[in-house]
Amino acid sequence: MRLHLIRHPKPLIESGICYGRLDCPAEDVPSVADTLLAELPQGLPVWSSPLRRCRALAEHLHPAPQIDERLVEMDFGSWEGVRWDDVPRAELDAWAADVAGYAPPGGESPLMLQRRALAFVASLTVPEAVIVTHAGVIRTLLAHWQGMPPAAWPQLVFAYGSRTTVVVPR
């Protein structure tokens, strides 16, 4: 199965804010969509995270994208909407010590995110699809498929509006 994993365009939010599940809009959606439409095969089904920054792009790529909650970004719990500089140092250190397993207070861990993202992919029955989602979802999926140890996960970085195409064994 061929998947085109697309990170949403840049969100309209102040720099330095943790915004995982915050439902903020994105900037420059039509321009990003035009670029992707020129690159992607035509007529593919499109799935999207329900958050506006993904959904708006998905709606430019397909007249009726399918929305799936499993594609939403990691839940950062009490960190949501907080400046990264204001997140308690001890909590950030705990996350750095256990990149995959640590969950922010009231949130989920990257491993939890990875489980739901893999369940989404396992549910697909099409040979090729476009998935509009978030960096965390793309990162945990690629880390799984590439067999990367959790300490290497932060090396996987994706630009806003970027496309990563992978072939996933069934």
Question: Where would I find each of the regions flagged by the language model?
Answer:
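Phosphate-coordination/substrate-recognition cap region in phosphate-metabolizing enzymes
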Residues: 33-91
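Active-site catalytic microenvironments for nucleophilic, acid-base chemistry
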Residues: 60, 123, 144-148
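Short, active-site-adjacent cap segments at secondary-structure transitions
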Residues: 12, 53-55, 73, 137-140
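Short glycine/proline- and acidic residue-enriched helix-loop micro-motifs
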Residues: 92-111
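Domain-level recognition of soluble alpha/beta enzyme cores
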Residues: 146-170
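Loop-to-helix element that buttresses phosphate recognition and phosphoryl-transfer chemistry
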Residues: 2-57, 105-117
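Generic beta-sheet signal
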Residues: 3, 44, 127-136
